[in-house]
């Protein structure tokens, strides 16, 4: 129920925006909203990529640490 915007809700929002801002300002607001959404998507994509890179580095470091610990245990037992 919450989080989903259907066609009736979008039409209501557009009607309210048309009443508040008028027909001349509406295209400008649409362009501004579109560019803002594009920038937001780009920023979230970059952030997601950085998080994935850090996760990979952590996995690599963790696996190399485990291998070093195993090597140290083997050296101590011999």
Swiss-Prot record:
Extract the ranges annotated as region (Disordered): 50-78
Q: Which stretches are tagged as biased composition: Basic and acidic residues?
A: 59-78
Q: In which domain of life is the source organism classified?
A: Bacteria
What Pfam families does this protein map onto? Answer: TatA_B_E
Major localization class: membrane
Source organism per UniProt: Natranaerobius thermophilus (strain ATCC BAA-1301 / DSM 18059 / JW/NM-WN-LF)
- Tell me where the transmembrane regions lie: 1-21
Role description: Part of the twin-arginine translocation (Tat) system that transports large folded proteins containing a characteristic twin-arginine motif in their signal peptide across membranes. TatA could form the protein-conducting channel of the Tat system.
Protein keywords? Cell membrane, Membrane, Protein transport, Translocation, Transmembrane, Transmembrane helix, Transport
The name this protein carries in UniProt is Sec-independent protein translocase protein TatA
> What is the protein's membrane topology class?
Single-pass membrane protein
Q: Which gene name does the record give?
A: tatA
